């Protein structure tokens, strides 16, 4: 086997910078399963652990690398264009025991938008190591989330801007065990960055004083980083002269513990009294030792099948089990926050100072099973068409679901194409439309203190369009020998 090494360091550096610079948006919880390559948007990633279409098989099932017999680089990206609109009512309540007066402030809203467009790039590389083994390298973003409701929105006390970006670098190896069985494994080195913001305020008090309810609003900005290590392993069965393939891939759970800082900006960031004539005075209070609990991103099991019906037509399918039940809560410690003094004496009424607080957000996700089916049709030697679709249930529940991720069950329809432009360059395009089986529903209550709570009750519309593009460079492929 002739191997001509290309500037791999340059290819990988470019790919890593691309993924690090990207925002991401949720798909199926906040999994970016379909976005691991570009061509997968053309069939909703049906059969992805068995097809071994290109070097991206190193991520979806590294055993499939044995079928990549030429050095290859894949550059891909998926544009995510979502819809997330909510209508409902938010209620900030202070329920005091009699004879004290209870204070309630409500806002009614209609079709507020929290969706954020995103671009998710990926890079894959394959290098044959003799006749029976292939090395691979994948740079992907397996999980991501971005919603932005804005600091003035009616749901600001639950969330404003939320972002999760992950970058996963995986060296992989696939080897043929027998004529019909191949094994593969990859090491997952994953960097994650999170932003988890909201507004803290006292709209119930300001409203009772006939003042602007937003007068005390202060932004708590929380940012953290984490690094985790995991793995993925796969097996591929090849039968019927390789026209029938069965693949299984296991992606391990990834544990993250985020460390960073928390910054409170606004009137509640400096000591004062909300009844003082000088209120509000703007300030900044920062906590530099913010950290989270151990957050376990789920392990994933993919079972895929691929079958060539004839020389032009192939069928594909996948079952993807995601163990979301590992994601139970998000707890941030040392969050920059205000603390109001509790009387008696009455002289302290309205006084507030700054503290490093603990913020707990229950999630209690449940495991999900995603289904995808698809087909390939070879029009000629240069053009292949793809279609697919499937069902992807939400892991969220009706009690803990909040506006950071207004998720619901969804169906998918996909179409795409591969065009072999030259002997060495192939181009893929794909499109997936995600539409919901029911409207997303929010009915979340956050306990802020022993007597104060914040509730958002809403329903709305959700969906997304995914547009994938991919260029596959087969670096070492020799041109076909002339026939004359």
Feature names for model-found ranges:
Residues 2-26:
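Gram-negative bacterial Sec-dependent N-terminal signal peptides
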Residues 28-44, 48, 86, 95-101, ...:
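Outer-membrane beta-barrel porins/channels
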Residues 43-65:
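Single transmembrane alpha-helix segments in multi-pass membrane proteins
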Residues 46-48, 72-81:
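Short strand-turn segments of transmembrane beta-barrel domains in outer membranes
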Residues 64, 79-83, 185:
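Short active-site-proximal "capping" loops at secondary-structure junctions
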Residues 103-108:
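Short glycine/proline- and acidic residue-enriched helix-loop micro-motifs
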């Amino acid at each position: 086997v002739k191997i001509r090494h290309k500037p791999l360091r340059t290819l990988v550096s470019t790919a890593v910078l691309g993924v690090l610079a990207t925002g991401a948006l949720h798909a199926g919880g906040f999994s970016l399963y379909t976005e691991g390559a570009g061509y997968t948007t053309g069939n909703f990633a049906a059969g992805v652990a068995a097809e071994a279409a290109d070097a991206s098989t190193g991520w979806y099932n590294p055993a499939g690398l044995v079928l990549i017999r030429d050095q290859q680089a894949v550059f891909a990206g998926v544009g995510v264009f979502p819809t997330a609109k909510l209508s409902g009512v938010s209620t900030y309540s202070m329920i005091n025991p009699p004879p004290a007066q209870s204070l309630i402030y409500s806002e009614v809203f209609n079709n507020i938008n929290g969706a954020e467009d995103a671009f998710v790039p990926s890079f894959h590389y394959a290098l044959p190591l003799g006749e029976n083994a292939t090395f691979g390298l994948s740079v992907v973003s397996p999980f991501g989330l971005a919603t932005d409701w804005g600091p003035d929105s009616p749901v600001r006390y639950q969330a404003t801007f939320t972002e999760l970006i992950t970058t996963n670098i995986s060296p992989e190896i696939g080897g043929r065990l027998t004529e019909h069985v191949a094994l593969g494994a990859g090491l997952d080195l994953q960097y994650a960055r999170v932003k988890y913001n909201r507004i803290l305020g006292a709209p119930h008090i300001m409203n009772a004083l006939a003042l602007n309810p937003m007068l005390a609003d202060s932004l708590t900005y929380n940012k953290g980083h984490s690094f985790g290590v995991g793995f993925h392993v796969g097996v591929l069965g090849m039968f019927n002269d390789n026209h029938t393939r069965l693949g299984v891939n296991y992606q391990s759970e990834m544990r993250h513990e985020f460390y960073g800082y928390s910054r409170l900006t606004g009137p509640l960031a400096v000591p004062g009294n909300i009844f003082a004539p000088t209120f509000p005075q703007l300030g900044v209070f920062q906590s530099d030792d913010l950290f989270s609990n151990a957050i376990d991103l789920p392990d994933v099991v993919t079972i895929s099948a691929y079958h060539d019906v004839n020389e032009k037509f192939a069928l594909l399918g996948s079952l993807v089990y995601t163990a979301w039940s590992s994601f139970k809560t998000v707890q941030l410690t040392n969050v920059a926050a205000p603390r109001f003094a509790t009387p008696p004496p009455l002289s302290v009424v309205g006084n507030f100072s700054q503290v490093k607080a603990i913020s707990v957000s229950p999630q209690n996700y449940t495991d999900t099973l995603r289904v995808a089916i698809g087909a390939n049709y070879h029009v000629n030697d240069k053009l292949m068409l793809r279609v697919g679709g499937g069902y992807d249930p939400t892991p969220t529940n009706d009690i803990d679901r909040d506006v950071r991720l207004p998720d619901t069950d969804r169906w998918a329809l996909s179409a795409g194409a591969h065009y072999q432009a030259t002997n060495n360059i192939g181009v893929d395009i794909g499109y997936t439309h995600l539409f919901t089986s029911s409207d997303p529903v929010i009915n979340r209550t956050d306990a802020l203190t022993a007597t104060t709570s914040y509730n958002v009750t809403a329903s709305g519309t959700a969906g997304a369009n995914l547009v994938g593009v991919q260029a596959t460079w087969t670096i070492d492929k020799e041109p076909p020998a002339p026939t004359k």
